[in-house]
């Protein structure tokens, strides 16, 4: 490599970067290295739709469980929040706190009672020992050497008895104090419970009164709406035959006018036919046939149009007559029903019908009068029911006011 003629020599060794050797003019070698970077890891290709769908299918159960868990936690927290608000509104929290205080006071009182029991037992045991010492002291003569020892022991035991008695009295005082605190906690708990019961009763009473008022208002509104619907129905039933008769009269007048126009047209046509006679000259005879043909065509077209229009009017009149017959039957049936209602309401004023229904024999005037009478009676009945409901509501509210005042004053 050193004997090559080019001025550059390349040396490549496995694991070693390329080294570029350049021989200078003065015989010195200049080394230059070139670092080759290895290519990075090839990026993975895009996933296929099947793999994406499979991964989504595997993730769906976990997502569903997480979503269900979050929804459950949210629902639980919401329900707990509303339940806490309800308990705070009703007063259950105060009652629960008072019951907790009662429990704590009871525990303290039981501890104080145990201390009193122990102090009493210790005092009784010490008094028994002191009695034994006194008995021995009574049996020993004062000249004996044990007398001084027994007297000293008695003196010590008397001091111990005094201390135990003081402790017993203090334990009793503590027991009385704890018992008074326990009694106060019990009274407070009972007071809170009674207040909660009174509050619940008052709110239930207020809710009942409001519910009754809302029910009366709703029934009044429903009765008023029904009365308005009944009025509209009766007015429609009353105005129906009149409007139909007016339509029939208008159609009949238009039909008579069309018949009159048709008759005038026929008269004009006959006049034109008779006017075209043999007294005219040849020139006029030569020029008249096209004119007469045009006049005849125009008149025949007008005649056909009038005939078709008259047929349409006739068919409309037939349809209106059928509708009028059906409406008359319906009105007669309604009149019969009204007659039956009147006979049921006033049995002494209306004679009983023998055999068939007399509804087809009633006239339109009597039917309208019967409908008006029924409307007036129904309106009077609905107004009477509304007045009664209002009076009952007012009386109930007036009777409830003193009770509410007394309850709120007591609470």
UniProtKB/Swiss-Prot annotation:
Q: What is its main location?
A: mitochondrion
The biological process GO terms on file are: cell volume homeostasis; mitochondrial potassium ion transmembrane transport; potassium ion transmembrane transport
- What reaction gets catalysed by this protein? K(+)(in) = K(+)(out)
Give me the Mitochondrial matrix side stretches, as residue ranges: 36-201, 408-411
Entry keyword annotation includes Membrane: yes
Segments on the Mitochondrial intermembrane side according to the record's topology features: 223-386
Query: What keywords tag this UniProt record?
Result: Coiled coil, Ion channel, Ion transport, Membrane, Mitochondrion, Mitochondrion inner membrane, Phosphoprotein, Potassium, Potassium channel, Potassium transport, Transit peptide, Transmembrane, Transmembrane helix, Transport
Name the segments for region: Disordered: 274-294
What does the activity regulation annotation say?
Channel activity inhibited by ATP via ABCB8/MITOSUR subunit.
Q: Might you report a single GO cellular component term? A: mitochondrion
Per UniProt, the transit peptide runs over: 1-35
Spell out the subcellular localization from the entry: Mitochondrion inner membrane
Functionally, this protein is described as follows:
Pore-forming subunit of the mitochondrial ATP-gated potassium channel (mitoK(ATP)). Together with ATP-binding subunit ABCB8/MITOSUR of the mitoK(ATP) channel, mediates ATP-dependent K(+) currents across the mitochondrial inner membrane. An increase in ATP intracellular levels closes the channel, inhibiting K(+) transport, whereas a decrease in ATP levels enhances K(+) uptake in the mitochondrial matrix. May contribute to the homeostatic control of cellular metabolism under stress conditions by regulating the mitochondrial matrix volume.
What name is this protein filed under? Answer: Mitochondrial potassium channel
Give the source species.
Homo sapiens (Human)
- Record gene name: CCDC51
């Amino acid at each position: 490599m050193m004997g090559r003629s080019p001025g550059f020599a390349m040396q490549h060794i496995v694991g070693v970067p390329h080294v570029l050797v350049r021989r200078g003019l003065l015989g010195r070698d200049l080394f230059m290295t070139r670092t080759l970077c290895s290519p990075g890891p090839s990026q993975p290709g895009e996933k296929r739709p099947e793999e994406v769908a499979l991964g989504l299918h595997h993730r769906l159960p976990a997502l569903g469980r997480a979503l269900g868990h979050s929804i459950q936690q949210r629902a639980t927290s919401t329900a707990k929040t509303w339940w806490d608000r309800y308990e705070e509104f009703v007063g259950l929290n105060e009652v629960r706190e008072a019951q907790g205080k009662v429990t704590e006071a009871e525990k303290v009182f039981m501890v104080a009672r145990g201390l009193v029991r122990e102090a009493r037992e210790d005092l009784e045991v010490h008094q028994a020992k002191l009695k034994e010492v006194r008995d021995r002291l009574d049996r020993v003569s004062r000249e004996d050497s044990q007398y001084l020892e027994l007297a000293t022991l008695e003196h010590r035991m008397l001091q111990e008895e005094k201390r135990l008695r003081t402790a017993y009295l203090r334990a009793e005082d503590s027991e009385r104090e704890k018992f008074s605190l326990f009694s106060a906690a019990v009274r407070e708990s009972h007071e809170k419970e009674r207040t909660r019961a009174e509050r619940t009763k008052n709110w239930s009473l207020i809710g009942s009164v409001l519910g009754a008022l809302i029910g009366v208002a709703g029934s009044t509104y429903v009765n008023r709406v029904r009365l308005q619907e009944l009025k509209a129905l009766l007015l429609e039933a009353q105005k129906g035959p009149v409007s139909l008769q007016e339509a029939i009269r208008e159609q009949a007048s238009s039909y008579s006018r069309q018949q009159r126009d048709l008759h005038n047209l026929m008269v004009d046509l006959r006049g034109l036919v008779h006017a075209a006679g043999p007294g005219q000259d040849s020139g006029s005879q030569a020029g008249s046939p096209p004119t007469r043909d045009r006049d005849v065509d125009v008149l025949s077209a007008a005649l056909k149009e009038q005939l078709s229009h008259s047929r349409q009017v006739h068919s409309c009149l037939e349809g209106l007559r059928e509708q009028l017959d059906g409406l008359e039957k319906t009105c007669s049936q309604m009149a019969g029903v009204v007659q039956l209602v009147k006979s049921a309401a006033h049995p002494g004023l209306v004679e009983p019908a023998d055999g068939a229904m007399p509804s087809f024999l009633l006239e339109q005037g009597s039917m309208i009068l019967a409908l008006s009478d029924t409307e007036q009676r129904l309106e009077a009945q609905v107004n009477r029911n509304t007045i009664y409901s209002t009076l009952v509501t007012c009386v109930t509210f007036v009777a409830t006011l003193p009770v509410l005042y007394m309850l709120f004053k007591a609470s």
